[in-house]
């Protein structure tokens, strides 16, 4: 999550967010070029001394401003389509994490392992230590291995929720009676925070998400310890 003195994007914790940032820069560059060209044309038209009172048509100009926007949209659409298919693609996941939203906490199930399921509640102010983030810390963190393809399944037991980790570029709705899925890969170790991003009731602001990314070997040790 964004913290103090932060006005830019978060440091990427997944390959997906890196691609989304590249696309953002690509689209922003094109938009800046369009804005500059339009501003230059408007200023030059306003401050020059040329006029044509009887100008009724200009086929050349109309052809130019029809073809150029078409090519511009193509240059924006192609990377966008690539990202859409990249987000939806599920390829040989090593870990499947099922997330169930409740009012107002999360339940996590590791479908690849037996007896590995827990609830995750926000820590109250009295239980925080000086190094915790207020409204973002939970009693049970979600443990995931880095450099591993992770399949995320989401659903809800009551109303619509949204499971979101901004630094990983992950945002997926958790709808009652429906199972949604997406995949992502964490590219480094660390602790990454998120929150429910769909207004789900009075305590919507108090159902945070906390992911702890660790090495695959330590993940296996944690699974063996938690499954006992």
Swiss-Prot record:
Residues in compartment: Mitochondrial matrix:
49-62
Residue intervals on the Mitochondrial intermembrane side? 1-26, 83-228
One GO term of the biological process aspect: ATP synthesis coupled electron transport
**Enzyme Commission designation:** 7.1.1.9
Cite the cofactor comment: Binds a dinuclear copper A center per subunit.
So where does Mg(2+) get bound?
198
Class in the EC hierarchy, top level? translocase
The record gives the membrane topology as: Multi-pass membrane protein
Q: Where does Cu cation A1 bind?
A: 161, 196, 200, 207
**One cellular-component annotation, GO:** mitochondrial inner membrane
Cofactor(s) needed for function = Cu cation
Complexes and interactors: Component of the cytochrome c oxidase (complex IV, CIV), a multisubunit enzyme composed of a catalytic core of 3 subunits and several supernumerary subunits. The complex exists as a monomer or a dimer and forms supercomplexes (SCs) in the inner mitochondrial membrane with ubiquinol-cytochrome c oxidoreductase (cytochrome b-c1 complex, complex III, CIII).
Protein name per its UniProtKB record: Cytochrome c oxidase subunit 2
From which source organism is this entry? Adalia bipunctata
